[in-house]
């Protein structure tokens, strides 16, 4: 979620992050999520998912001339498999999907975002 990725961005000096936006009402998470438009499928998409992090990753890498090997992707669901596979570093975070785990470079099973810190340094 953006509340976590923005914290990591600020702490480690990333240029930017893209993630689902967790909605809050009166400082309490509602459970609703906004999906960035860069995730949405279009005629250039390389996968069949309606929304996919790979769409955003390819778009951003192309726009800023970044090699895919210099990217890090965190995912937990089937719709993340194609992006985890293409990223320079793919992380399965608390996934119950064996395919996600099988394509990831790193697997984190404990729901603890602190486990990500050594991987982004």
Q: Where are the model-predicted features located?
A:
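C-terminal cap/substrate-recognition subdomain and adjoining C-terminal extension
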Residues: 1-121
């Amino acid at each position: 979620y953006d509340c976590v990725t923005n914290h990591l961005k600020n702490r480690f000096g990333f240029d930017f992050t893209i993630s689902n936006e967790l909605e809050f009402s009166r400082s309490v998470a509602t459970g609703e999520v906004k999906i960035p438009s860069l995730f949405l499928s279009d005629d250039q998409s390389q996968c069949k998912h309606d929304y996919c992090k790979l769409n955003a990753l390819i778009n951003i890498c192309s726009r800023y001339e970044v090699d895919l090997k210099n990217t890090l992707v965190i995912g937990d669901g089937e719709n993340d498999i194609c992006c985890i596979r293409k990223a320079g570093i793919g992380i399965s975070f608390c996934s119950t999907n064996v395919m996600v785990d099988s394509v990831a470079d790193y697997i984190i099973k404990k729901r603890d975002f602190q486990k990500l810190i050594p991987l982004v340094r």
